[in-house]
Regions:
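A short beta-strand element within beta-rich, extracytoplasmic domains
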Residues: 5-22
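Aromatic- and Gly/Pro-enriched, solvent-exposed loop/edge beta-strand patches characteristic
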Residues: 27-97
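Short, conserved, surface-exposed binding loops centered on an aromatic residue
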Residues: 1-3, 23, 97
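Extracellular and analogous surface-interaction loops
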Residues: 1-7, 62-66
Length: 97
């Protein structure tokens, strides 16, 4: 981080873009924030429906993380559906001020 800030908000979305007929389960995408290569308790998740291109969003504000100048911020993305035929698009915006 170039300057000190408090990461207070994650705005996350997920959307199913491609699936096979056998893909009946939704996919939950979760983002975990890392500070200096260590996981923090700040997470955010959204569960994409099985309807193609239906966007599901979530805004998370619990467990803010304070960063000092020189700290590193990392993101770990995980998802619940391991199907090789299900494609979930996801993304997030972060507010650190």
């Amino acid at each position: 981080m170039p300057v000190a800030c408090s990461l207070s908000t994650i705005a996350l979305y997920a959307s199913t873009d491609k699936k096979a007929a056998a893909d009946l389960n939704a996919d939950t995408v979760m983002l975990t924030i890392y500070k200096n290569n260590s996981a923090t308790s700040m997470t955010c998740s959204a569960t994409a429906t099985t309807t193609l291109h239906q966007v599901v969003s979530n805004t998370c504000t619990s467990s803010p993380v304070s960063f000092n100048a020189g700290d590193t911020l990392g993101m770990e993305w995980t998802h619940s559906n391991a199907s090789f035929t299900l494609y979930t698009q996801y993304g997030a915006g972060l507010r650190c001020q």
